[in-house]
């Protein structure tokens, strides 16, 4: 997805982890191709990113024009490059980031972002989208009305603070179309993360319940 026109310049090989930690190598094959080695998909993505940065001198971020455009032959590494991760768990994101632009991203934006996460070695991304679908189902199973639950939720840009039990209803009610759309999007996000050997961090119950629950219990 990042450099599709140059895929025939690369060879992917699997190697063992180093003392239980992710490791990658960049080398040259006998027929002059660029070899990216890693102990899993994430490590290969890291090798690819390091090749782009240190050998091809090209940077990629989630705002980059994708795919990248590199004219001519790709440069070869002078010697084998090997790197091992110093930490087993590499976490990224925080609760509040899901109230900035994340609530309004489509799949195309998320796909680029997830590629960037993998290329930079993140294996424990916090992924909080779509959880309102779960809570909607839970509160309905307790006998609450859908309209009351929608009014309890905050609007998209304020959901992080609602999820932390700081506020209710602000900027709401939350449309069912948004709840369903974020749920579908989250399933695609999680599937892609797992394809790239990530283990996404998901939310648990924070103890925050709708006021209307008092009318039922």
Q: Model-found features: residue ranges?
A:
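Aromatic-lined carbohydrate-binding surfaces of glycoside hydrolases
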Residues: 2, 14-17, 33-37, 41, ...
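Residue-level recognition of short, structured coil/turn motifs
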Residues: 3-4, 57
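The feature marks proteins involved in alpha-glucan
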Residues: 56-78
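Short active-site loop/helix that positions an aromatic residue
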Residues: 42-55
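N-terminal regions that are enriched for targeting/export leaders
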Residues: 5, 10, 15-29, 73
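N-terminal helix-rich structural modules
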Residues: 20-23, 35-36, 45
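Surface-exposed patches in mature extracellular/periplasmic domains of secreted proteins
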Residues: 7-11, 60-64, 128
């Amino acid at each position: 997805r990042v450099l599709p026109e140059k895929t025939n310049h690369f060879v992917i090989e699997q190697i063992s982890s180093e003392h239980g930690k992710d490791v990658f190598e960049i080398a040259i094959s006998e027929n002059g191709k660029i070899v990216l080695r890693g102990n899993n998909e994430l490590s290969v993505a890291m090798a690819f990113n390091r090749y782009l940065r240190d050998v091809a001198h090209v940077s990629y971020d989630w705002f980059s024009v994708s795919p990248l455009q590199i004219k001519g032959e790709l440069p070869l590494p002078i010697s084998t490059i090997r790197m091992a991760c110093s930490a087993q768990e590499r976490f990224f994101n925080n609760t509040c980031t899901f109230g900035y632009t994340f609530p309004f991203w489509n799949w195309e934006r998320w796909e680029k972002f997830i590629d960037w996460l993998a290329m930079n070695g993140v294996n424990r991304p916090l992924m909080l989208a779509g959880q309102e679908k779960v809570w909607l189902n839970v509160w309905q199973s307790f006998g609450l009305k859908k309209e009351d639950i929608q009014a309890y939720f905050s609007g998209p840009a304020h959901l992080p603070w609602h999820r932390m039990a700081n506020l209710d209803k602000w900027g709401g009610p939350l449309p069912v179309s948004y709840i369903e759309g974020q749920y579908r999007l989250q399933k695609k996000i999680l599937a892609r993360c797992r394809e790239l050997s990530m283990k996404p961090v998901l939310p648990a119950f924070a103890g925050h319940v709708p006021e209307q629950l008092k009318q039922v219990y």
